[in-house]
């Protein structure tokens, strides 16, 4: 049984600068809560070294993100996927249940050459414009950014007639302050979002489960099932 959905692909093809198709779970469109999870970026590396071949493959393969997630579902995945799943009480053997419910893609469209590298201002601005276009297609009810460094370049939305805000919480979890924000589109659509500590960096699934369960209990309840 297919656990991903390609019904939005024709619309994704019209999004400027969108390099990879987002992952859309087979149950996402009909879910009681549409949840979008954002990763940060792909890396053009072969082992620990930059790979031009991997870079070229990355930017030429629209199915790249979907392939990574499919591999994570089948083989157990990287820390990003494993600890994200554990945040919602999923063991690896139930990964397909989790990913069939949600949508996900990576924010920065150009593959990074170094794990510790920071995306340029231009890359961040392009990413926000892509994000705005993508969410108007798939209409999530909530978005959770995995990581806390996404707000750079958000002012690119000012020229798109999209109102936005972002703020820090006053609590600290895993040495990080989570963030909350919202995008408000001119057609009335509003997208609240959270930014949490990156799941691959000294991350405690139970602590973040408790935080999200306090903030958005109906979403966590749906994902926990």
Where are these regions (language model features)?
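C-terminal capping/extension of enzyme domains
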Residues: 2-7, 12, 118-132, 152-225
């Amino acid at each position: 049984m297919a656990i991903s959905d390609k019904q939005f692909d024709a619309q994704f093809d019209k999004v400027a600068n969108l390099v990879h198709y987002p992952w859309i779970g087979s149950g996402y469109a009909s879910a009681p809560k549409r949840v979008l999870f954002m990763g940060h970026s792909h890396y053009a590396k072969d082992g620990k070294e930059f790979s031009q071949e991997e870079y070229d493959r990355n930017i030429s393969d629209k199915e790249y993100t979907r392939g990574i997630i499919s591999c994570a579902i089948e083989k157990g995945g990287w820390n990003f996927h494993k600890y994200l799943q554990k945040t919602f009480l999923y063991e690896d053997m139930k990964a397909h249940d989790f990913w069939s419910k949600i949508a996900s893609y990576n924010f920065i469209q150009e593959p990074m050459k170094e794990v510790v590298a920071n995306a340029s201002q231009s890359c961040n601005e392009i990413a926000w414009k892509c994000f705005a276009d993508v969410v108007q297609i798939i209409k999530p009810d909530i978005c959770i950014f995995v990581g806390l460094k996404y707000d750079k370049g958000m002012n690119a939305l000012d020229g798109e007639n999209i109102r936005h805000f972002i703020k820090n919480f006053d609590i600290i979890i895993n040495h990080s302050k989570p963030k909350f924000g919202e995008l408000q589109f001119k057609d009335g659509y509003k997208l609240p979002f959270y930014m949490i500590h990156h799941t691959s960096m000294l991350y405690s699934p139970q602590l973040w489960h408790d935080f999200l369960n306090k903030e958005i209990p109906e979403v966590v309840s749906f994902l926990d099932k």
